[in-house]
Amino acid sequence: MFTVPILIGSLFAMIAAAIHVVIFVLESFRWNLPQTWRIFGIRSQEDANRTEFLAYNQGFYNLFLAIGAALGALFHFENTVAAFTLTLFACSSMVLAAVVLVTASPSSLRPALIQGVPPLAAVISTVVGILAIP
């Protein structure tokens, strides 16, 4: 079943997925570059080297969430139950991760908003769309 809010939710889920793929690339493959570690508040190359394995692992978490959100968005037109489940799980996880980020580090509000607002919009739009299905 298809509704306009579901289409909007799919769009926001794809935006959230794209953001998380970029984060994956930065954390898993570009972590030791000064322009990358500065984005994440790392103060020195030594600190970047020390935290590289953590960032690598975290990057893959972001990739897996991105895959879930993207597949959910793409499947909305094929298998709605699976699509809704994937979208709501992946995007809710992204939103909760953003909440954890800002509660653990209040100075990280901007990154939390970047990673959390699109999936929140996806969750809200998808739920509204589900409720609109007759």
Where are these regions (language model features)?
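Juxtamembrane boundary at the C-terminal end of a transmembrane helix
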Residues: 124-134
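Membrane-interface helix-boundary signature
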Residues: 2-12, 48-51, 80-87, 108-111
